[in-house]
Amino acid sequence: MKAMIFAAGLGTRLKPLTDHMPKALVPVAGRPMLEHVILKLKEAGFTELVINIHHFGEQIIDFLKANQNFGLTIHISDERDRLLDTGGGIKKAATFFTGTEPFLVHNVDILSNADLKEVYDFHRKKSESGYTAGQPAKTSRHLLFDTDNRLQGWIHKDTLQTKPEGFVYEPGQYREYAFSGIHVISPELFHYMEGEAWKGKFPIMDFYLHTCQQLQLGGCIKEDLQLIDIGKPDTLARAEEFLKD
């Protein structure tokens, strides 16, 4: 099984920790956050990883070499010349995901109790183009799913902005969840990234929302999903407690 880890971020929320190191190597409970994600993927049965790099990318390369790639096959998708955001990063790494086998994508700054093998297998059983692990929304930004857990749109509850263009939000008609930073993608999606809008830098969520009416993009909704965004200083201490439990 294959997976991709987003490790190219600038880590601006973690300054000054990221003034001299990449966000992916900021320690959490004595280990770099990248190591936590790699080991979680390895435990779930993933054997081949792609890791994108940008900010202090050479430190990530050295870290992986020093740890013998944790016994896995690891490829580097090098974005040191230009940061491509999540969608552009996935598209740049497309050459590592040939064939029809889906791959899991995981943010480096996320800790969770998600069973990654379960999320991956759930996607394969559904035979959909893409799948995201969702959790009850705690922010004003909500992904909107129908009763079959198919992605229909997005709304910002404070501003009432909606996506995609032309989407009309009807209260009470949707299951509303937050994006977890964990998703599974079928390589067939790369065929839909050929347009001008999907060149260079772009967020993957913009792509999902633009194509959700023509593709089958589903949600693996976990009401008991516990997730911590460790990309912020105030959550690092909570993350250490989370890992102890």
Predicted ranges, named:
Residues M1-A29, K42-A44, I221:
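Glycine-rich N-terminal loop/short-helix segment of MobA-like nucleotidyltransferase
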Residues K2-I5, R31-N107, E118, W198-K199:
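Conserved N-terminal catalytic core of the sugar/cofactor nucleotidyltransferase
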Residues L10, V108-I110:
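Active-site metal-binding loops of divalent metal-dependent hydrolases
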Residues R13, Q59-D62, T86, K92, ...:
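Phosphate- and divalent-cation-binding pockets in alpha/beta enzyme and binding domains
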Residues L25, I76-S77, G130, W154, ...:
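Generic preference for hydrophobic
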Residues H54, S77-E79, A133, C220-E223:
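Conserved beta-strand termini and adjacent loop/short-helix elements that scaffold enzyme active sites
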Residues E101-L104, L111, K117-R124, A137-K138, ...:
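Catalytic-core segments of class I nucleotidyltransferases/pyrophosphorylases
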Residues K126-P136:
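A short, conserved acidic/glycine-rich loop-to-beta-strand motif
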